[in-house]
């Protein structure tokens, strides 16, 4: 016999935990399921922009200062550098710092907050069956639950999404991929003649190594996140060899690429209508990842918040949750994904012409591009979309 809940959320990462937090605060009975025990490691560069911190403050009451003090954020930097291979396109300081986190710590913090708000969590057992029509969700061990509403927040390989009639071929066509590893600062391989960026206290991104993608070096408190990511269809099996080239450029052993981990990444295959019957999809499960730089944490947090609010409306006012959810996505998320994909096509196509097109674009955009990345301005023609932090502007040199 199945146990009935108002809402079952599959996936306890940022999207699922945020939806659970919103619903539990409203007194809704929420069951949060995840195949992993928490804390667990998650492959992610772990960079948060201002817009992500804004959601954390609104939903959880967390501030950047408080998260840094508690160790949930491990470092912050207003600085940045953008390179086309060795040549610097731009460097400077943003009006607001980038914050860095380890997903093992960050996701556990959000889950703990949702449970403290009243959500029930069942961890360590995979969901193997979902019926969007009846709201039945079954675990690998055979235990079943029935829900009035299901939120699928179970990542890029979502079991919930695959139970719905979405176009699997289109999803696969738009997939990206990433390879990444962490290198502790005390690793002896950093003591030799390595690239200066490996000792920089700010994040650096690199064009020119992939036709449709980029590389990165992000500084955390105790280690560096080093990786590449891009469109799988264009690069496929080249990823590892391109990663070796990138590591050689940084002065690191090429064989580090062979020990690195890879994962799929939504890269333009977002679902414009991520719902079916009793199901709403959020975060990576719906492909809601920014399609230029691959930023995913903000879109997971915001779509989780929107999904939670939409289901709460459905339970209290009897509305179809797809209506408020779709409205929120069309207002806050989908335009950013559409226009970042347009920008990606232009910028990646221009890489074949070398350094100059990217240099002119970044230098011409200046302060406005910094506001776009942090979410104060939209990818849609750089229109203003939020008030942002008190100070505005960024220095570019």
Whereabouts are the PLM-identified features?
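A conserved beta-strand/loop capping segment in the N-terminal third of enzymes
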Residues: 52-54, 58-109
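C-terminal helical "tail/cap" subdomain of flavin- and related membrane-associated enzymes
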Residues: 309-397
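Glycine-rich FAD pyrophosphate-binding loop
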Residues: 24-44
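Beta1/beta-strand and adjacent pyrophosphate-binding region of the FAD-binding site
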Residues: 2-15
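Glycine-rich phosphate/pyrophosphate-binding beta-alpha loops
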Residues: 46, 97-100, 214, 286-298
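Residue-level detector of alpha-helix initiation sites
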Residues: 13-14, 38, 298
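FAD/FMN-dependent oxidoreductases across multiple families
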Residues: 129, 144, 234-310, 315, ...
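Predominantly flavin-linked oxidoreductase catalytic cores and closely associated redox partners
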Residues: 113-254, 271, 287
């Amino acid at each position: 016999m199945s146990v009935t809940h108002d809402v079952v959320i599959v996936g306890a990462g940022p999207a699922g935990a945020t939806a659970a937090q919103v619903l539990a605060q409203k007194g809704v009975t929420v069951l949060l399921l995840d195949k992993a025990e928490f804390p667990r490691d998650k492959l992610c560069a772990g960079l948060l922009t201002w817009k992500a911190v804004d959601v954390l403050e609104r939903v959880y009451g967390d501030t950047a200062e408080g998260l840094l003090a508690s160790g949930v954020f491990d470092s912050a930097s207003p600085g940045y550098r953008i390179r086309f291979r060795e040549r610097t396109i731009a460097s400077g300081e943003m009006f607001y710092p980038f914050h860095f986190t380890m997903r093992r710590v960050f996701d556990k913090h959000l889950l703990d907050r949702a449970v403290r708000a009243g959500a029930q969590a069942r961890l360590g057992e995979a969901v193997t069956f979902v019926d969007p029509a009846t709201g039945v969700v079954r675990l690998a061990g055979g235990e079943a639950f029935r829900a009035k509403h299901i939120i699928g927040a179970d990542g890029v390989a979502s079991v919930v999404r695959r139970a719905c009639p979405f176009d699997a071929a289109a999803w696969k066509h738009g997939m990206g991929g990433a390879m990444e590893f962490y290198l502790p600062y005390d690793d002896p391989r950093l003591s030799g003649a390595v690239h200066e960026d490996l000792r920089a206290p700010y994040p650096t991104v690199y064009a020119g190594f992939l036709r449709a993608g980029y590389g990165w070096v992000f500084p955390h408190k105790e280690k560096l996140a080093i990786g590449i990511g891009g469109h799988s269809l264009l690069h496929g099996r080249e990823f590892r060899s391109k990663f070796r080239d990138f590591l050689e450029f940084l002065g690191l052993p090429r064989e580090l690429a062979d020990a690195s981990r890879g994962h799929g990444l939504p890269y333009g295959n977002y679902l414009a209508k991520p719902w079916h019957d009793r199901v709403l999809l959020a975060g990576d499960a719906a492909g809601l990842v920014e399609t230029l730089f691959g930023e995913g944490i903000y879109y997971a947090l915001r779509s989780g918040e929107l999904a939670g609010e939409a289901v709460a409306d459905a339970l209290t006012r009897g509305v179809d949750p797809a209506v408020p959810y779709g409205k929120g996505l069309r207002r806050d998320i989908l335009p950013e994904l559409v226009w970042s994909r347009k920008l990606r096509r232009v910028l990646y196509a221009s890489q074949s012409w070398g350094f100059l097109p990217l240099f002119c674009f970044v230098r011409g955009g200046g302060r406005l591009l910094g506001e776009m990345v942090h979410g104060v301005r939209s990818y849609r023609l750089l229109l203003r979309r939020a008030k942002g932090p008190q100070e505005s502007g960024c220095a570019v040199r």
